[in-house]
Swiss-Prot record:
Residues 99-131 are annotated as: Disordered. Gene3D superfamilies: 3.30.70.60. One of its GO terms (biological process) is translation. It comes from Sodalis glossinidius (strain morsitans). HAMAP family: Ribosomal_bS6 (MF_00360). This is Small ribosomal subunit protein bS6. It holds the Pfam family Ribosomal_S6. GO terms for cellular component: cytosolic small ribosomal subunit. Residues 120-131 have a biased composition (Acidic residues). PANTHER family: MITOCHONDRIAL 28S RIBOSOMAL PROTEIN S6, SMALL RIBOSOMAL SUBUNIT PROTEIN BS6M.
Length: 131
């Protein structure tokens, strides 16, 4: 079986259906003896350019190992699902399991925000004790 990186963008009005879509696509892959190495739901993000007069979309990234028949079926499902506004399936040489740069950046921002909140709380606690 080959390794693939799949990214698809969902219409922003259909964001609540993304969890179900991921579940269906995951079941399709694992049902054919495939493996999901990485699954990332990036959430709603700004598009670089408008697509069908839309400026935002819900992004999902999958790194999978699956037979060609499953990939063909996924392409067909993406094509006929009106909620999927764009999709791309690329073959990669190796399984990618590490976090994507998008998720790494998001985690770093979250850590910085938590550190700042902790520092702010410590500063306010120190200021209260001096009074």
């Amino acid at each position: 079986m080959r390794h693939y990186e799949i990214i698809f963008m969902v219409h922003p009005d259909q964001s609540e259906q993304v969890a179900g879509m991921i579940e269906r696509y995951s079941a399709l892959i694992t049902g054919a003896e495939g493996q999901i190495h990485r699954l990332e739901d990036w959430g709603r993000r700004q598009l670089a350019y408008p697509i069908n007069k839309l400026h935002k979309a819900h992004y999902v990234l999958l790194n999978v190992e699956a037979p060609q028949e499953v990939i063909d079926e996924l392409e067909t499902v993406f094509r006929f699902n009106d909620a999927v506004i764009r999709s791309m399936i690329m073959r990669v040489k190796h399984a990618v399991t590490e976090a994507s740069p998008m998720v790494k950046a998001k985690d770093e921002r979250r850590e910085r925000r938590e550190d700042f909140a902790t520092e702010t709380n410590e500063d306010s606690d120190a200021g209260d004790s001096e009074e």
